[in-house]
Amino acid sequence: MKIVLSKEEVLELIHNSLCNSSMLAQCGIQLKHTKEQYAAAKARLLEETPDKGLCLEDVWIEILKGEGKLPFYDTEGEEDLEITIEKAMENLQKEEASEHILDMQNGNDDAITASAILEICIYGEVVFG
């Protein structure tokens, strides 16, 4: 089954997955933003919504929205990786993603679901299981 998602739905899935997926770090995949990128994204969010409490994931999504990509690094493969909104929208339409998307949208998700969604956004498939 192919699921067609809006840009906002894709960003929400990525946000929720970032909140719940510590498993990528266990696979050697780490976020790789700079302090400057983080500070600029946080400043933009605080300017837009000064009364809103921010979490790390809000800022990471703002980096993705503002710069067009969220950088990662594969410490084992020594490779730069990234999520782009366009690539995530394309990859999340693959049949393999459907089960994980539905689990998250229905509240039946966990760290494994979140990791699978991020892997699909980055690699186009679940790599680490």
Q: How should each PLM-predicted stretch be described?
A:
Residues 18, 23-29, 87-95, 100, ...:
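Motif-centric detector for short Cys/His coordination patterns
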Residues 49-52, 93-97, 110, 123:
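Exposed regions on extracellular, virion, or secretory-pathway luminal proteins
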Residues 1-68:
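Long, contiguous N-terminal structural blocks used for assembly/anchoring
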Residues 7-11, 38, 56-57, 81, ...:
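Short amphipathic alpha-helical segments that mediate assembly, nucleic-acid/protein binding
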Residues 66, 72-103:
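Acidic, low-complexity, intrinsically disordered interaction modules
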